[in-house]
Amino acid sequence: YKRQNVYNVMAAVAIALAEQIDKKTIVDVLNGFDGVPGRFQLVEAGQPYTVIVDYAHTPDGLENVLKTARSITEGKLWVVFGCGGDRDNKKRPIMGRIALELADRVVVTSDNPRTEDPAVIIDEIAEALKDVPEGKSVELIAERRDAIYHALSEAAANDVIMIAGKGHENYQILADKTIHFDDREVVQEYWKKR
């Protein structure tokens, strides 16, 4: 699970050594390092499958986390993601294509739609999701909490659910307001209700 952090850790160690920090201190710090919040972060809530939250919000980022998640998936790989509003809309179908190529179950939802209509953003992602191969599925669920709940309720033991796009963020920007929203808390909330 920590593969995503290897390059960052190697860079940090190189800098620490260049700054002449002793090796024991470096090892002690690394032993206490749980990873960067919202970056390939495991969310444990007693579920029979793996849930990972990641900030991946670009085509390259989504591809990398899904490839890593695929390498640890014994069952189906789920991805719940959306794209931000008022941002590069050309990446939306590209991210849809990546999700469909690398995941078994794709759930497209809202991210931070900002001033854009969430349905328009989802439709632009869905342009790449028209020809769904046999054995795969695509769901379009605009409300992010509902999309996450859907994946959590449908996943089976040994599946991996990647909730991508918001990572460490604890808010969602909807038109003229910002609300509290944290993907990690939504997972915990779902399992507390069970």
Give the positions of each predicted feature.
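Conserved small/polar residues in nucleotide/adenosyl-binding loops
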Residues: 1-4
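ATP-dependent carboxylate-amine ligase
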Residues: 11-194
